[in-house]
Swiss-Prot record:
EC number(s) on file: 4.1.1.23
Gene Ontology CC entries for this record: cytosol
Binding-site residues, substrate: 10, 32, 59-68, 119, 180, 189, 209-210
Pfam families in UniProt: OMPdecase
MF (Gene Ontology): orotidine-5'-phosphate decarboxylase activity
Family per record: Belongs to the OMP decarboxylase family. Type 1 subfamily.
SUPFAM superfamilies named among the record's database cross-references: Ribulose-phoshate binding barrel (SSF51366)
Catalytic activity annotation: orotidine 5'-phosphate + H(+) = UMP + CO2
NCBIfam families membership: PRK00230.1, pyrF
Subunit structure: Homodimer.
Gene from which the chain derives: pyrF
Species of origin: Legionella pneumophila (strain Corby)
Record's function text: Catalyzes the decarboxylation of orotidine 5'-monophosphate (OMP) to uridine 5'-monophosphate (UMP).
Protein name: Orotidine 5'-phosphate decarboxylase
Lineage: Bacteria, Pseudomonadati, Pseudomonadota, Gammaproteobacteria, Legionellales
């Protein structure tokens, strides 16, 4: 069974990242590798996590012309990752090209999800880049585009999960960042929820970083979260 919890490995060096990984159990959580760590350590680090039997969410948010994104997704799949993402704002052709690039992997193909609206965004920031939709409208619009393109789901704030499920179906995966424990500050993310709130809203997978990575006992925090969920 795939764990509902995805731990974000937001580190700037390999030693700290691996120290945390050694305290975690692949049966209890998946791992997210983002741009910072991937740029620093490259594909070999991802392969090492896969070798340790962790499910890896490669969070590189590909956004380019369709052919380039298709090749990037195929390269990511070669690493053995469980999930990867692209920016939905890249458009229908780009999303379809990404999906097509993974067909050769058959039933073993990674999950392909699309980023809707970053959880750091607020209404004013959407307007500043020329988007007149509200945050829920934009997230839902992009989720429906991803669904039309045949993707498996989206990355979305928990605030938009319920409407996305209504529009795209219960089987359309929602991966939710911006998850904070009740005693944690918002940090640099604006639209946050606790794990329990996000699950009630219908989130399928929760991405949690600092509350786990900065904990004195990460394994204990993960265990407590799983009990609560």
């Amino acid at each position: 069974m795939t764990p509902k919890l995805i731990v974000a490995l937001d580190f700037d060096n390999q030693d700290n990242a691996l120290q945390l990984v050694e305290k975690l159990d692949p049966n209890h959580c998946a791992l997210k590798v983002g741009s910072e760590l991937f740029t620093l350590l490259g594909p070999q680090f991802v392969k090492e996590l896969v070798r340790r039997e962790f499910k890896v969410f490669l969070d590189l948010k590909f956004h380019d012309i369709p052919n380039t994104v298709a090749k990037a997704c195929h390269s990511a799949a070669e690493l053995g990752v469980w999930m990867m993402n692209v920016h939905a704002i890249g458009g229908l052709k780009m999303l379809q090209a990404a999906r097509e690039s993974l067909k050769t992997y058959g039933k073993d193909k990674p999950l392909l999800i699309a980023v809707t609206v970053l959880t750091s965004f607020e209404e004013a920031e959407l307007a500043s880049v020329g988007i007149s939709n509200t945050l829920p409208e934009q997230a839902t619009h992009l989720a429906m585009l991803a669904r039309e393109a045949g993707l498996d789901g989206v990355v979305s704030s928990a605030h938009e999960v319920k409407i996305i499920k209504q529009k795209c179906g219960e089987n359309f995966i929602t991966v939710t960042p911006g998850i904070r424990l009740p005693n944690n500050l918002k940090d640099d993310q604006s639209r946050v929820m606790t794990p329990q709130q996000a699950i009630r809203e219908g989130s399928d997978f929760l991405v949690i970083g600092r509350p786990i990575t900065q904990a004195s006992n990460p394994h204990e925090v993960v265990s407590a979260l799983l009990r609560d969920l």
